Regions:
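Bacterial Sec-dependent N-terminal signal peptides
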Residues: 1-9
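Bacterial N-terminal signal peptides
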Residues: 11-21
Length: 331
Protein backbone atom coordinates (compact mmCIF):
# COMPACT_ATOMS: atom_id res chain seq x y z
CA UNK A 1 0.00 0.00 0.00
CA UNK A 2 1.34 3.40 -0.91
CA UNK A 3 1.24 5.68 2.13
CA UNK A 4 0.02 9.21 1.52
CA UNK A 5 0.90 11.73 4.22
CA UNK A 6 -1.62 14.56 4.50
CA UNK A 7 -0.59 18.17 4.92
CA UNK A 8 0.12 18.73 8.58
CA UNK A 9 0.86 15.06 9.31
CA UNK A 10 3.77 14.32 11.60
CA UNK A 11 5.30 10.89 11.92
CA UNK A 12 8.82 10.01 12.93
CA UNK A 13 9.00 6.23 12.69
CA UNK A 14 12.26 5.17 14.29
CA UNK A 15 13.12 1.48 13.96
CA UNK A 16 14.30 -0.34 17.05
CA UNK A 17 12.24 1.69 19.51
CA UNK A 18 10.32 -0.38 22.01
CA UNK A 19 7.20 0.56 23.94
CA UNK A 20 7.99 0.91 27.61
CA UNK A 21 6.25 2.71 30.39
CA UNK A 22 8.30 5.85 30.81
CA UNK A 23 5.75 7.66 32.97
CA UNK A 24 5.40 6.83 36.67
CA UNK A 25 2.27 4.94 37.67
CA UNK A 26 -0.57 6.87 39.22
CA UNK A 27 -0.62 7.11 42.99
CA UNK A 28 -3.91 5.73 44.30
CA UNK A 29 -5.71 5.92 47.60
CA UNK A 30 -5.73 3.20 50.21
CA UNK A 31 -8.79 0.97 50.16
CA UNK A 32 -11.97 2.80 51.02
CA UNK A 33 -10.19 6.09 51.65
CA UNK A 34 -11.51 9.42 50.40
CA UNK A 35 -9.03 12.24 50.08
CA UNK A 36 -9.59 15.96 50.06
CA UNK A 37 -9.48 15.83 46.28
CA UNK A 38 -11.62 12.86 45.37
CA UNK A 39 -12.96 9.34 45.81
CA UNK A 40 -11.48 6.07 44.55
CA UNK A 41 -13.87 3.61 42.87
CA UNK A 42 -13.07 -0.06 42.23
CA UNK A 43 -14.41 -2.32 39.47
CA UNK A 44 -13.96 -6.12 39.51
CA UNK A 45 -15.69 -8.13 36.78
CA UNK A 46 -15.24 -11.42 38.67
CA UNK A 47 -16.01 -10.67 42.31
CA UNK A 48 -17.72 -7.29 42.20
CA UNK A 49 -21.43 -6.49 42.38
CA UNK A 50 -23.36 -3.58 40.97
CA UNK A 51 -25.29 -3.42 44.22
CA UNK A 52 -22.07 -2.25 45.91
CA UNK A 53 -21.06 1.38 46.26
CA UNK A 54 -17.70 0.73 44.58
CA UNK A 55 -15.63 2.63 47.14
CA UNK A 56 -13.45 -0.27 48.34
CA UNK A 57 -11.94 -3.45 46.91
CA UNK A 58 -14.36 -5.51 49.00
CA UNK A 59 -17.32 -3.49 47.67
CA UNK A 60 -16.25 -3.16 44.04
CA UNK A 61 -18.63 -2.59 41.15
CA UNK A 62 -18.97 -5.41 38.63
CA UNK A 63 -19.67 -3.61 35.34
CA UNK A 64 -18.57 -0.47 33.56
CA UNK A 65 -22.19 0.68 33.43
CA UNK A 66 -21.81 1.69 37.07
CA UNK A 67 -18.81 3.84 36.21
CA UNK A 68 -20.71 5.47 33.35
CA UNK A 69 -23.55 6.30 35.74
CA UNK A 70 -21.23 8.21 38.09
CA UNK A 71 -20.71 11.94 37.90
CA UNK A 72 -16.98 11.92 38.50
CA UNK A 73 -15.55 14.84 40.44
CA UNK A 74 -12.08 16.43 40.30
CA UNK A 75 -9.57 14.12 41.93
CA UNK A 76 -11.69 10.98 41.56
CA UNK A 77 -9.93 7.75 40.55
CA UNK A 78 -11.50 4.70 38.90
CA UNK A 79 -9.48 1.48 39.23
CA UNK A 80 -10.23 -1.64 37.16
CA UNK A 81 -8.95 -4.87 38.68
CA UNK A 82 -6.28 -6.71 36.75
CA UNK A 83 -7.58 -9.98 35.35
CA UNK A 84 -11.04 -8.50 34.80
CA UNK A 85 -12.71 -8.97 31.42
CA UNK A 86 -15.57 -6.64 30.48
CA UNK A 87 -17.46 -8.17 27.55
CA UNK A 88 -19.85 -6.07 25.44
CA UNK A 89 -19.02 -2.99 27.54
CA UNK A 90 -17.50 0.45 27.13
CA UNK A 91 -16.45 3.47 29.16
CA UNK A 92 -18.12 6.77 28.30
CA UNK A 93 -17.04 10.07 29.84
CA UNK A 94 -18.73 13.45 29.44
CA UNK A 95 -18.06 17.10 30.27
CA UNK A 96 -19.50 16.49 33.74
CA UNK A 97 -16.74 13.94 34.45
CA UNK A 98 -13.93 16.48 34.04
CA UNK A 99 -11.19 17.02 36.57
CA UNK A 100 -9.12 20.16 37.10
CA UNK A 101 -5.49 21.07 36.54
CA UNK A 102 -4.84 20.54 40.24
CA UNK A 103 -6.97 17.37 40.54
CA UNK A 104 -7.40 15.41 37.30
CA UNK A 105 -9.70 12.40 37.04
CA UNK A 106 -7.65 9.20 36.72
CA UNK A 107 -8.55 5.80 35.26
CA UNK A 108 -6.07 3.05 36.12
CA UNK A 109 -5.71 -0.48 37.52
CA UNK A 110 -5.16 -2.39 40.75
CA UNK A 111 -4.24 -5.91 41.78
CA UNK A 112 -2.04 -8.50 40.06
CA UNK A 113 -2.30 -10.28 36.72
CA UNK A 114 -3.19 -9.35 33.16
CA UNK A 115 -4.42 -5.93 32.15
CA UNK A 116 -8.15 -5.29 32.59
CA UNK A 117 -9.67 -6.03 29.21
CA UNK A 118 -12.60 -4.18 27.64
CA UNK A 119 -14.00 -6.18 24.70
CA UNK A 120 -16.61 -3.85 23.27
CA UNK A 121 -17.82 -6.04 20.38
CA UNK A 122 -19.75 -3.26 18.64
CA UNK A 123 -21.44 -1.99 21.81
CA UNK A 124 -20.77 1.43 23.35
CA UNK A 125 -22.44 3.18 20.41
CA UNK A 126 -22.80 6.94 20.16
CA UNK A 127 -23.78 9.48 17.49
CA UNK A 128 -20.97 11.29 15.70
CA UNK A 129 -22.00 14.45 13.85
CA UNK A 130 -19.55 17.05 12.58
CA UNK A 131 -22.53 19.34 11.96
CA UNK A 132 -21.39 20.05 8.41
CA UNK A 133 -20.22 18.11 5.34
CA UNK A 134 -16.45 17.65 5.21
CA UNK A 135 -13.84 19.03 2.82
CA UNK A 136 -14.29 15.93 0.68
CA UNK A 137 -18.04 15.62 0.14
CA UNK A 138 -17.66 11.88 -0.41
CA UNK A 139 -16.54 11.36 3.18
CA UNK A 140 -19.14 10.34 5.73
CA UNK A 141 -19.67 13.03 8.38
CA UNK A 142 -22.34 11.66 10.71
CA UNK A 143 -23.57 8.33 11.99
CA UNK A 144 -23.21 5.65 14.66
CA UNK A 145 -19.81 4.80 16.10
CA UNK A 146 -18.83 2.10 18.57
CA UNK A 147 -15.93 2.99 20.90
CA UNK A 148 -14.37 1.09 23.78
CA UNK A 149 -13.68 4.44 25.46
CA UNK A 150 -15.45 7.69 24.55
CA UNK A 151 -14.10 10.97 25.95
CA UNK A 152 -16.63 13.65 25.00
CA UNK A 153 -15.88 17.20 26.15
CA UNK A 154 -14.06 15.71 29.14
CA UNK A 155 -10.91 17.50 30.21
CA UNK A 156 -8.21 16.90 32.79
CA UNK A 157 -8.55 13.14 32.52
CA UNK A 158 -5.73 10.59 32.51
CA UNK A 159 -6.19 6.95 31.44
CA UNK A 160 -3.60 4.18 31.68
CA UNK A 161 -2.94 0.45 31.75
CA UNK A 162 -6.02 -0.93 29.95
CA UNK A 163 -6.46 -3.41 27.08
CA UNK A 164 -9.14 -2.60 24.48
CA UNK A 165 -10.66 -4.56 21.59
CA UNK A 166 -13.60 -3.84 19.30
CA UNK A 167 -13.84 -6.41 16.53
CA UNK A 168 -16.62 -8.34 14.78
CA UNK A 169 -15.78 -11.84 16.01
CA UNK A 170 -18.02 -12.09 19.05
CA UNK A 171 -21.29 -14.00 18.85
CA UNK A 172 -22.94 -10.94 20.38
CA UNK A 173 -21.71 -8.62 17.62
CA UNK A 174 -24.43 -7.74 15.12
CA UNK A 175 -21.79 -7.50 12.37
CA UNK A 176 -20.04 -10.81 13.01
CA UNK A 177 -20.72 -12.01 9.46
CA UNK A 178 -19.65 -8.84 7.63
CA UNK A 179 -16.51 -8.89 5.51
CA UNK A 180 -13.45 -6.86 6.45
CA UNK A 181 -14.06 -4.42 3.58
CA UNK A 182 -17.85 -4.22 3.83
CA UNK A 183 -18.75 -0.66 2.79
CA UNK A 184 -21.59 -0.52 5.32
CA UNK A 185 -19.68 -1.85 8.32
CA UNK A 186 -20.05 0.19 11.49
CA UNK A 187 -17.37 2.70 12.43
CA UNK A 188 -15.34 1.60 15.47
CA UNK A 189 -12.63 2.94 17.74
CA UNK A 190 -10.50 1.85 20.64
CA UNK A 191 -10.46 5.37 22.12
CA UNK A 192 -12.52 8.21 20.61
CA UNK A 193 -12.26 11.82 21.72
CA UNK A 194 -14.81 14.51 20.86
CA UNK A 195 -14.51 18.23 21.57
CA UNK A 196 -17.78 20.08 21.02
CA UNK A 197 -19.48 22.08 23.77
CA UNK A 198 -16.60 22.85 26.13
CA UNK A 199 -14.53 25.38 24.19
CA UNK A 200 -10.86 24.44 24.47
CA UNK A 201 -10.69 20.96 25.98
CA UNK A 202 -7.52 20.72 28.07
CA UNK A 203 -5.28 17.88 29.22
CA UNK A 204 -6.17 14.39 28.06
CA UNK A 205 -3.49 11.77 28.73
CA UNK A 206 -3.52 8.24 27.30
CA UNK A 207 -0.62 6.21 28.66
CA UNK A 208 0.36 2.54 28.33
CA UNK A 209 -2.79 1.31 26.54
CA UNK A 210 -2.84 -1.92 24.53
CA UNK A 211 -5.39 -1.54 21.72
CA UNK A 212 -5.88 -4.32 19.19
CA UNK A 213 -8.39 -5.96 16.86
CA UNK A 214 -10.45 -2.88 16.11
CA UNK A 215 -12.26 -3.64 12.84
CA UNK A 216 -13.78 -0.32 11.84
CA UNK A 217 -15.02 0.70 8.41
CA UNK A 218 -12.13 0.76 5.93
CA UNK A 219 -13.54 3.72 3.96
CA UNK A 220 -14.88 6.27 6.47
CA UNK A 221 -11.60 7.96 7.29
CA UNK A 222 -12.94 10.78 9.51
CA UNK A 223 -15.56 8.78 11.44
CA UNK A 224 -13.21 7.95 14.34
CA UNK A 225 -12.29 4.59 12.85
CA UNK A 226 -9.23 2.91 14.30
CA UNK A 227 -7.08 2.77 17.40
CA UNK A 228 -7.14 6.31 18.84
CA UNK A 229 -8.97 9.18 17.13
CA UNK A 230 -9.75 12.70 18.42
CA UNK A 231 -12.12 14.95 16.46
CA UNK A 232 -13.82 18.33 16.86
CA UNK A 233 -17.57 18.73 16.18
CA UNK A 234 -19.67 21.84 15.59
CA UNK A 235 -20.71 23.29 18.98
CA UNK A 236 -24.38 23.53 19.87
CA UNK A 237 -23.89 27.25 20.56
CA UNK A 238 -20.41 28.41 19.63
CA UNK A 239 -21.14 31.97 20.75
CA UNK A 240 -21.62 30.67 24.30
CA UNK A 241 -19.04 27.90 24.62
CA UNK A 242 -16.42 29.17 22.18
CA UNK A 243 -14.58 27.56 19.28
CA UNK A 244 -14.11 23.87 19.99
CA UNK A 245 -10.51 22.63 19.97
CA UNK A 246 -7.96 20.69 22.03
CA UNK A 247 -4.99 21.77 24.08
CA UNK A 248 -2.58 19.33 25.73
CA UNK A 249 -3.35 15.89 24.32
CA UNK A 250 -0.72 13.31 25.26
CA UNK A 251 -0.68 9.83 23.71
CA UNK A 252 2.34 7.86 24.85
CA UNK A 253 3.70 4.38 25.55
CA UNK A 254 0.74 2.75 23.75
CA UNK A 255 0.80 -0.41 21.64
CA UNK A 256 -1.67 -0.73 18.75
CA UNK A 257 -2.07 -3.88 16.64
CA UNK A 258 -4.57 -4.69 13.88
CA UNK A 259 -6.54 -1.45 14.06
CA UNK A 260 -8.61 -0.12 11.20
CA UNK A 261 -8.85 2.40 9.60
CA UNK A 262 -6.48 4.80 11.38
CA UNK A 263 -3.72 4.17 13.89
CA UNK A 264 -3.64 7.45 15.83
CA UNK A 265 -5.22 10.72 14.67
CA UNK A 266 -5.81 14.04 16.41
CA UNK A 267 -7.45 17.24 15.27
CA UNK A 268 -9.89 16.84 12.36
CA UNK A 269 -12.38 19.69 12.88
CA UNK A 270 -15.66 21.17 11.75
CA UNK A 271 -13.59 24.30 11.08
CA UNK A 272 -11.85 22.62 8.13
CA UNK A 273 -12.79 25.53 5.83
CA UNK A 274 -10.36 27.75 7.77
CA UNK A 275 -7.49 25.63 6.46
CA UNK A 276 -8.14 25.60 2.71
CA UNK A 277 -5.74 28.40 1.72
CA UNK A 278 -2.25 27.63 0.52
CA UNK A 279 -0.53 29.44 3.38
CA UNK A 280 -1.94 29.28 6.90
CA UNK A 281 -1.33 32.19 9.24
CA UNK A 282 -0.16 31.75 12.81
CA UNK A 283 -3.38 33.43 13.95
CA UNK A 284 -5.55 30.91 12.10
CA UNK A 285 -3.61 27.96 13.48
CA UNK A 286 -3.72 29.29 17.04
CA UNK A 287 -7.44 30.08 16.89
CA UNK A 288 -8.83 27.01 15.14
CA UNK A 289 -6.14 24.35 15.43
CA UNK A 290 -5.40 22.13 18.41
CA UNK A 291 -2.23 22.83 20.38
CA UNK A 292 0.32 21.01 22.53
CA UNK A 293 -0.34 17.59 21.01
CA UNK A 294 2.32 15.05 21.96
CA UNK A 295 2.40 11.54 20.45
CA UNK A 296 5.48 9.66 21.57
CA UNK A 297 6.99 6.26 22.28
CA UNK A 298 4.15 4.28 20.68
CA UNK A 299 4.25 1.02 18.70
CA UNK A 300 1.90 0.39 15.76
CA UNK A 301 1.52 -2.85 13.82
CA UNK A 302 -0.95 -3.84 11.07
CA UNK A 303 -2.68 -0.49 10.64
CA UNK A 304 -5.45 -0.47 8.04
CA UNK A 305 -4.69 2.99 6.62
CA UNK A 306 -2.89 6.09 7.89
CA UNK A 307 -0.54 5.37 10.78
CA UNK A 308 -0.26 8.65 12.73
CA UNK A 309 -1.70 12.00 11.69
CA UNK A 310 -1.93 15.34 13.45
CA UNK A 311 -4.58 17.20 11.44
CA UNK A 312 -4.61 20.98 11.78
CA UNK A 313 -2.68 21.03 15.03
CA UNK A 314 -0.84 24.27 15.73
CA UNK A 315 2.66 23.92 14.35
CA UNK A 316 4.11 26.55 16.64
CA UNK A 317 2.73 25.24 19.91
CA UNK A 318 4.55 22.01 20.64
CA UNK A 319 2.83 19.53 18.34
CA UNK A 320 5.25 16.62 18.43
CA UNK A 321 5.43 13.03 17.23
CA UNK A 322 8.57 11.16 18.20
CA UNK A 323 10.08 7.79 19.17
CA UNK A 324 7.32 5.80 17.48
CA UNK A 325 7.71 2.55 15.57
CA UNK A 326 5.44 1.37 12.75
CA UNK A 327 5.86 -2.23 11.62
CA UNK A 328 3.55 -2.54 8.64
CA UNK A 329 0.30 -1.38 7.13
CA UNK A 330 -2.42 -3.86 6.24
CA UNK A 331 -2.18 -4.64 2.56
Amino acid sequence: MKKKWMSGALALLLAGTTVASMVPAFTVNAEGQDTATGTTYYVDSKSGSDSNDGTSESKAFKTLDKVNALNLEPGDTVLLKKGSVFEDQALQFTKEDSGTAEAPVKISTYGEGDRPQINTNGHGQWDLNYGTPLDNRNHKWKGKVSSSILIKDTEYIEIEGLELTNDRKSATDTEKNKAYNDAYAMDRTGVAGVAKDNGTVDHIVLNDLYIHDVTGNVYNKHMTNGGIYFIVETPTNEATTGIARYNDVQIKNCSLDKVNRWGIAVGYTYQWSQFTTGALSDATMAKYGSSNVVIENNYLNHVGGDAITCIWTDRWFNTMCQRTQLNRLIQ
